[in-house]
Amino acid sequence: MAVAYCCLSLFLVSTWVALLLQPLQGTWGAPLEPMYPGDYATPEQMAQYETQLRRYINTLTRPRYGKRAEEENTGGLPGVQLSPCTSPPVGLIPCSAPWS
């Protein structure tokens, strides 16, 4: 019983520490916007703010790859890839177009 209690408490403490060491993130896992250092900040503080702001903007605007990109030509069916001729018509381009 004492061994089980010791293992459980060690597991809970290690989980708690691991959660505390995670970087702070906002809603839906987005990073928090950096705080503006103020109008009277030193050039070093402004440079650090600029670096953090650039990283924040790049994180929010980076292109997303993966599942969303793969679902473009599936017709709503998972695991099925449709040819351009069987896809729903988008414009007036015929199926025998040389670029399709």
Swiss-Prot record:
No icosapeptide-like peptide is cleaved from the C-terminal. Keywords: Amidation, Cleavage on pair of basic residues, Hormone, Secreted, Signal. InterPro entries: Pancreatic_hormone-like (IPR001955), Pancreatic_hormone-like_CS (IPR020392). The modification Tyrosine amide is found at Y65. It is found in: Secreted. SMART domains: PAH (SM00309). Residues 1-29 form the signal peptide. Its main location: secreted. GO terms for cellular component: cytoplasm; extracellular space. Transmembrane segments: none annotated. Belongs to the NPY family. This is Pancreatic polypeptide prohormone. It comes from Mus musculus. The gene is Ppy.
